[in-house]
């Protein structure tokens, strides 16, 4: 074991990619490979790439080029490896291996073959693999939080999205498998589980013949983890059964991440979104009625081909009317291989940028107002960082999810400092459009 080459991982992209990274690290550690946190000292650098939009690809390419210039042995994994197989091998002679999105569990074998002098290409044309609770995992998140992937892949065909091509068809894990992993994480002291997949509300449809998210949430309610949070909930999948499960399961937070993408029926139809534009107002009102304390996050795409001034004004009015807690806005990115790539009436980048900036400016006072309502409350905060000099603590309250929302900055005062990764009561004293300020409450 002493002669095993060392490995570092450069992680790029989404939290689904992060779970892949963590499983690769877990498998390598189990096989006796030393993992180095500094790429400069590692024999091999695994670059887990993202290929979702142009900006993500550019970041992946920059990372690969920097490592190639440093003469590193590079193992390219993730969505870009799935997407641009031959191009990457041709352009980067330093790449000793290429591993697709459905093949990351073979990482130990790939490194062994590369060590023997083979240039490895391990890419399944149609990814079908999904790791379960038996696959080793080395977590890279803060102590208190873990992502739990409940399904992989997607059966929809949204016009702008390359993900089904890169990740394959939907395949769900069993409820028993997910609960077993949740129990393992609870035993490690994890306080927050974030459930992820491409479409969380479609969970189980491939395995059980119908969506089983409500049943999964109730099963996870038996696990000793204080916070369970969902990402990527499609509005049409928020059935009365799912709403009831959120309402009645104590550790499931009333936090909904809804990738709405637009409000205008014509744009939604052009996007080939599953609800074809029939939604959005009624569903938002239903959610707010069923879950009055719900925190709503959403994302929108501006500048989709053919989006008119009228379409955009419709979206602005929609955002002002519904007063979401958190909004992310992206400009349309034409992805080769998707139907939207060849659509007529593509908008200039400066028009798209201006629309994004205007929509974000409209949202800012709404987010400020929503955060102001927290001032004076005492809330549970998951402590994630401590400033070494000032002792200031940084964490998240239930209304903030990891990496995408705001933070709570805490003056420790005279109270003893809580452990990183623990939940502690904090009185909120101030707020801006993004973050909260607070003080520890003596216990």
UniProtKB/Swiss-Prot annotation:
Residue numbers binding [4Fe-4S] cluster 2: 154, 158, 161
Which cofactors does this protein require? Answer: [4Fe-4S] cluster
**PANTHER family in the cross-refs:** RIBOSOMAL PROTEIN S12 METHYLTHIOTRANSFERASE RIMO, RIBOSOMAL PROTEIN US12 METHYLTHIOTRANSFERASE RIMO
Annotated GO MF terms:
4 iron, 4 sulfur cluster binding; aspartic acid methylthiotransferase activity; metal ion binding; protein methylthiotransferase activity
What Pfam families has UniProt attached to this entry?
A: Radical_SAM (PF04055), TRAM_2 (PF18693), UPF0004 (PF00919)
Q: Does the keyword Iron apply?
A: yes
Function of the protein? Catalyzes the methylthiolation of an aspartic acid residue of ribosomal protein uS12.
The protein's name: Ribosomal protein uS12 methylthiotransferase RimO
């Amino acid at each position: 074991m002493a002669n095993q080459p060392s490995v570092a991982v450069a992680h790029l992209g989404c939290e689904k990619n992060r779970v892949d990274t963590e499983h690769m690290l877990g498998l390598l550690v189990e096989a006796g490979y030393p993992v180095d946190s500094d790429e400069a000292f590692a024999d091999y650098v695994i670059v887990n790439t993202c290929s979702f939009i142009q900006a993500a690809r550019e970041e992946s390419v920059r990372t690969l080029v920097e490592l190639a210039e440093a003469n590193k042995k590079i193992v390219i994994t993730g969505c870009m490896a799935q997407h641009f197989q031959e191009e990457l091998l041709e352009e980067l002679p330093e790449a000793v291996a290429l591993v697709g999105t459905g093949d990351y569990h073979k990482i130990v074998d790939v490194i062994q073959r590369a060590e023997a002098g083979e240039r490895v290409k391990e890419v399944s044309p149609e990814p079908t693999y999904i790791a379960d609770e038996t696959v080793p995992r080395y977590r890279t998140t803060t102590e208190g939080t873990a992502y739990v992937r409940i399904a992989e892949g997607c059966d929809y065909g949204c016009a702008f999205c390359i993900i089904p091509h890169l990740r394959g068809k939907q395949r769900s894990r069993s409820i028993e498998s997910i609960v077993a992993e949740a129990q393992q994480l609870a035993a490690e002291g994890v306080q927050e589980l974030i459930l992820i997949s491409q479409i969380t509300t479609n969970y189980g449809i491939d395995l059980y013949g119908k969506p089983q998210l409500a049943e999964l949430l109730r099963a996870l309610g038996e696990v000793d983890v204080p916070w369970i949070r969902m990402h990527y909930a499609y509005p049409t999948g928020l059935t009365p059964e799912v709403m009831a499960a959120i309402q009645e399961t104590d550790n499931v937070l009333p936090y909904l991440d809804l990738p709405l993408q637009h409000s205008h029926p014509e744009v939604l139809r052009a996007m080939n979104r599953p609800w074809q534009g029939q939604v959005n107002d009624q569903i938002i009102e239903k959610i707010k009625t069923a879950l009055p304390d719900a925190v709503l996050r959403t994302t929108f795409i501006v500048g989709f081909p053919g989006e008119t001034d009228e379409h955009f004004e419709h979206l602005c009015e929609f955002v002002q009317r519904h007063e979401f807690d958190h909004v992310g806005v992206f400009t349309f990115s034409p992805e080769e291989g998707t139907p939207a790539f060849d659509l007529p009436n593509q908008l200039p980048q400066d028009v798209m940028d201006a629309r994004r900036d205007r929509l974000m400016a409209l949202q800012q006072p709404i987010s400020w107002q929503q955060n102001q309502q927290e001032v004076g409350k005492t809330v549970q905060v998951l402590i994630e960082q401590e400033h070494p000099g000032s002792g200031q603590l940084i964490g998240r309250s239930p209304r903030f999810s990891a990496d995408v929302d705001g933070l709570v900055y805490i003056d420790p005062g005279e109270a003893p400092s809580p452990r990183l990764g623990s939940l502690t009561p904090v009185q909120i004293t101030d707020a801006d459009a993004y973050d909260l300020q607070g003080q520890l409450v003596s216990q």
